[in-house]
Design a protein with these regions (language model features):
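Conserved beta-strand hairpin/beta-sheet module of binuclear metal-dependent hydrolase folds
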Residues: 2-52, 157-171
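Divalent metal-coordination and catalytic microenvironments
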Residues: 9, 25, 35, 50, ...
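Metallo-beta-lactamase
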Residues: 31, 38-39, 147-149, 153-221
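Short catalytic-loop micro-motif centered on adjacent basic/acidic residues
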Residues: 32-35, 62-64, 145
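Active-site HxH/HxHxD metal-binding segment of metal-dependent hydrolases
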Residues: 42-44, 48-133, 231
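Glycine-rich phosphate-binding loop signature in dinucleotide/nucleotide-binding domains
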Residues: 53-58, 138-139, 197-199
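Charge-patterned, long linear interaction tracts outside catalytic cores
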Residues: 134-140, 145-154
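Accessory terminal helices/loops
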Residues: 194-202, 210-277
Length: 277
């Protein structure tokens, strides 16, 4: 598993699968592990690194789940025995599709003959985020949360120590993947610029692809995401063809075969939003 970013307080691990990121943040008071994922050896590497921090610092481990997509919760039980707290949104905790999500993990493991040294479970949340700008203080550490619906219905943004943990928004390797609502997604994107300023963000970490320390890069990604949503919605309203191949070539995205499936999913959701069918 690659470490694609590190400084004295933050390590971002990236899986070989979908360039999915897991983040470990050490503050003055806690070790925060975010979305530990994919393959057993990769999850084990994150666990090993976390154990080293615990041994050296004696700080408690907290888990944070940005949203409930199965790839982001797949490593939960590799850490549940050492986690003092588990953070996620109210919608995450009350998700009625928990068994469906667990089945997705089991199907993935079956397909590739993967065995794990831990049981597959849906995270048991001990600290529930249920309001905009909710704050959790642990010692001197302050975590501030914002609702981030759109990609799915239960996402949250988290800001801690000038680090913006965004979940599956503004990933530089993909356009918006919309599983819930394009309008909610758009509203979530519009929150980002004010937060960059209000919290003096020094590091932005998306759920897939590359983190960035460049605010202009964050805003460029934001603008391109809004442009994609607007253009797709416009093509649907005008009953015009959206040239996906040209879009992929223009934006230099690398994975057209699978990304076409996600684009078609976006089209289906946005057609339902426009026409109700």
């Amino acid at each position: 598993m690659k470490i694609i970013y590190h400084d004295k307080n933050v390590h971002v691990f990236q899986s070989a699968l979908f360039q999915t990121n897991s983040t470990v943040v050490e503050t003055n008071d806690i070790i925060l592990v975010v979305d530990p994922n994919w393959l057993p050896d990769e999850v084990g590497q994150i666990r090993h690194y976390t154990e080293g921090l615990v041994k050296a610092s004696k700080k408690p481990v907290w888990l944070l789940f940005t949203h409930s997509d199965y790839d982001h919760i797949i490593g939960y039980n590799a850490f549940s025995d050492i986690a003092e707290g588990v953070i996620a949104s109210r919608a995450f905790d009350e998700n009625l599709g928990q068994e469906v999500i667990l089945e997705q993990i089991k199907q993935f493991d079956d397909e590739y003959y993967i065995t794990r040294p831990y049981l597959i479970d849906y995270p048991s949340v001990s600290y529930i985020v249920e309001s905009e700008r909710q704050v959790l203080e642990i010692g001197q550490t302050k975590l501030t949360f914002f609702n981030a619906e759109g990609h799915n219905p239960d996402g949250i943004f988290t800001i801690v120590n000038n680090v913006f943990i965004a979940g599956d928004y503004l990933c530089d390797v993909e356009f918006p993947y919309i599983y819930y609502s394009s309008w909610a997604y758009q509203n979530t994107l519009n929150k980002i610029e004010p937060l960059l300023e209000a919290f003096d963000i020094q590091l932005f970490i998306s759920g897939h692809g590359n983190p960035t320390t460049d605010r202009d890069e964050v805003l460029r990604r934001r603008d391109e995401a809004l442009e994609y949503i607007g253009n797709v919605r416009g093509s649907i309203r005008a009953n015009k063809y959206f040239d996906f191949d040209k879009y992929m070539a223009d934006k230099k995205f690398q994975f057209p075969r699978i990304m076409r499936r996600f684009h078609e999913g976006n089209l289906n959701i946005m057609r339902q939003e426009e026409f109700g069918h």
